[in-house]
A protein has these predicted regions:
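Hydrophobic small-molecule pocket/channel-lining residues, especially in calycin-type beta-barrels
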Residues: 18-151
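Positively charged n-region of N-terminal signal peptides that target proteins for export
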Residues: 1-4
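N-terminal signal peptide c-region/cleavage motif recognized by signal peptidases
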Residues: 11-15
Length: 151
């Protein structure tokens, strides 16, 4: 009986993770900084289940190879997790919560980096991810909007 209960819990946890609409490979389409359209270099965000966490891996293609430049594996309950650069060095922390379905709130902190609040929203059809981030740099407020497409 205990084994069956453990199996059900594991199955439910796996199903809950798979049901997260953010799990996908997202390609950056365009971005705006403080309302002005900015040039967009190719960037890919892959979000995958990672045990009881989710792995967020940002990559840029170099010679047709996806080079991971930033990543973090975090629970969606606000637990602090490390943000790592391409070399695996910690460059900050992230806390992720899910205030409502298809909405993810991130608080990112790091030495020599501005604290940043990010809201990720998956569209109702599941094909678009919008990232809105706010920070203060050199005393000026910065609002970045990035739009990704599921591929």
């Amino acid at each position: 009986m205990k084994l069956f209960a453990a199996f059900l819990l594991l199955a439910f946890s796996s199903a809950a993770q798979a049901a997260q609409p953010i799990v996908a490979t997202w390609h950056l389409d365009h971005q705006e900084l403080n309302g002005e359209k900015k040039e967009t270099e190719e960037m890919i965000l892959r979000v995958t289940p990672d045990g009881d966490k989710f792995l967020f891996a940002f990559s840029v293609p170099i010679n047709n190879i996806a080079f991971v430049s930033l990543s973090y594996s975090a629970k969606l309950d606000g637990t602090e997790a490390d943000v790592k650069n391409a070399r695996g060095n910690k460059v900050g922390t992230v806390e992720i919560t899910v205030p409502s379905p298809s909405h993810y709130k991130l608080v990112m902190k790091g030495d020599n980096r501005p604290n940043t609040t990010v809201v990720l929203t998956v569209s109702p059809d599941g094909n678009t991810l919008t990232s809105q981030s706010d920070s203060t740099q050199a005393g000026k407020p910065m609002h970045l909007v990035q739009t990704f497409t599921r591929r």
